[in-house]
Amino acid sequence: MQLTAVGLNHQTAPLSIREKLAFAAAALPKAVRNLARSNAATEAVILSTCNRTELYCVGDSEEIIRWLADYHSLPIEEIRPYLYALDMQETVRHAFRVACGLDSMVLGEPQILGQIKDAVRVAQEQESMGKKLNALFQKTFSVAKEVRTDTAVGENSVSMASASVKLAEQIFPDIGDLNVLFIGAGEMIELVATYFAAKSPRLMTVANRTLARAQELCDKLGVNAEPCLLSDLPAILHDYDVVVSSTASQLPIVGKGMVERALKQRQSMPLFMLDLAVPRDIEAEVGDLNDAYLYTVDDMVNIVQSGKEARQKAAAAAETLVSEKVAEFVRQQQGRQSVPLIKALRDEGEKARKQVLENAMKQLAKGATAEEVLERLSVQLTNKLLHSPTQTLNKAGEEDKDLVHAVAQIYHLDK
C-alpha cells in the first residue's frame, strides 16, 4: 500500500458539501482508529477543519473514498466530484503546502499548522500511524517551520478572527455600542472574542453547553463579559447586535424561528450573525429574513484576501522551497525502500564469494599453484555475479527498454 491523501477543501467543494463530510472532534479518535483498521488503509490521519476534510493514509485511495462515503452514510456518487485522490509525491507536496498555509483560504494563515498537529496527536494516541505517516508529518512540520522562518508568506495575514470584526464594522459604525454574543467556547471563538474585546463592546456574552467553560473564557475577556448556557439562547438572543457561532454540534443550534422571534423584539434593528462552524450552527434560512445579516466561512473570502498580493510574492519563494523539500523527502523514502533489496544483493554476493573461495582453498590443498587458483577464482566469481543479470537481459531482449536502461545505469554503461 502506498502513501495517499483523499479529501476536499474550500476550493473543490461548497460549504453545503463540506459540512456533510466534516468529522466532529469527539468522533475523530474512533473514526481514525476505524479507518486504520479497515480494508482501506493500514495507517491514517484525519484532518477536519471548517475549510477542509482530508484523510492522509497508507492505503488504496478508491477504498478510502468508499470508507468516507460509508462513514457519513452518503452515496459515493454524491461526493466523488468534489474529492481529490493524490499519489505519493502529490500527497507529500500537498501536506507541505497545507501546513505552510499555501493552500489556505487565508494565504499563509498560521492556525492550520496547529490543526494538523492536533490531528496527528489524535492519530498517534489511537495508534493509527506507522513509519510512513510518521516520517511524512515529521518532515511536514520541519518544512512548515522553515518556510515560515525563511519567507514572508505569513506576514500581514488577515485571519478569520480579525476579519470577523472587520465585517461587523461594515454594518455597525462603532463596535463599542454593541452587545456581542459568542456561541461556543472553543479555540475559534476565543480568537474571535479576543479581537472583539480589543474594540471594547458594551457587553460580551459567551453561551456554551457548560457554564464552567463559558466562565473560563469570560475571565480571559474581561469585566464586561458574562457566561450563559446554550439553553438560554431563545430568551436572550434579541438583546444582541452581533452573534458569532462556532461549536462542534452536528445539528443547527440557532433556527429560523428563534431568529424571527428575536427580530420582532428588536423592532427592525439589524442583527449581524457570523457562522464559522462546519457543519453550520445557524440554519441557512435565517439569511432570508429581513434585518438578519448571516455570513458563513465561505462569505469571508473577499475580506480575508486583504494583503494577498504581497503574500503571493512571498508564496513564490515558499513554493520553490516546498518543491525542493518534496524531492528531498521522496528520495529519502525511495532510498529506504531500497534497503531490503540492497541487503539481499549483498547477501547473494557474499554467498558467491564464499563458494568460489571454498573451491579455491580445495584447489590449493590439491597442489594447484596460486596463480592458477587466482585465475580460476576470478573467472568463477565474475561468472557467478554476472550470470543472473546476463540471463535476464537475454530473456528481455530489446522489448523491455526500461530494464535494459536500468542495467546500463547500474553498471555505468550508459556514458
Swiss-Prot record:
Xref: SUPFAM superfamilies: Glutamyl tRNA-reductase catalytic, N-terminal domain, Glutamyl tRNA-reductase dimerization domain, NAD(P)-binding Rossmann-fold domains
Keyword annotations from UniProtKB, A to Z: NADP, Oxidoreductase, Porphyrin biosynthesis
GO MF assignments: glutamyl-tRNA reductase activity; NADP binding
Intrachain disulfide bonds: none
Positions annotated to bind substrate: T49, C50, N51, R52, S104, E109, P110, Q111, Q115
Keyword Cell inner membrane: no
Residue positions of the active site: C50 (nucleophile)
Chemical reaction(s) catalysed: (S)-4-amino-5-oxopentanoate + tRNA(Glu) + NADP(+) = L-glutamyl-tRNA(Glu) + NADPH + H(+)
Pathway the protein contributes to: Porphyrin-containing compound metabolism; protoporphyrin-IX biosynthesis; 5-aminolevulinate from L-glutamyl-tRNA(Glu): step 1/2
Biological process according to GO: protoporphyrinogen IX biosynthetic process from glutamate
Residue numbers marked as site, Important for activity: H94
This enzyme's EC code(s): 1.2.1.70
Transmembrane feature ranges: none
UniProt binding sites for NADP(+): G184, A185, G186, E187, M188, I189
Domain notes from UniProt: Possesses an unusual extended V-shaped dimeric structure with each monomer consisting of three distinct domains arranged along a curved 'spinal' alpha-helix. The N-terminal catalytic domain specifically recognizes the glutamate moiety of the substrate. The second domain is the NADPH-binding domain, and the third C-terminal domain is responsible for dimerization.
NCBIfam families: hemA
Leftover remarks: During catalysis, the active site Cys acts as a nucleophile attacking the alpha-carbonyl group of tRNA-bound glutamate with the formation of a thioester intermediate between enzyme and glutamate, and the concomitant release of tRNA(Glu). The thioester intermediate is finally reduced by direct hydride transfer from NADPH, to form the product GSA.
Function: Catalyzes the NADPH-dependent reduction of glutamyl-tRNA(Glu) to glutamate 1-semialdehyde (GSA).
Family (UniProt): Belongs to the glutamyl-tRNA reductase family.
Self-association and partners: Homodimer.
Annotated protein name in UniProt: Glutamyl-tRNA reductase
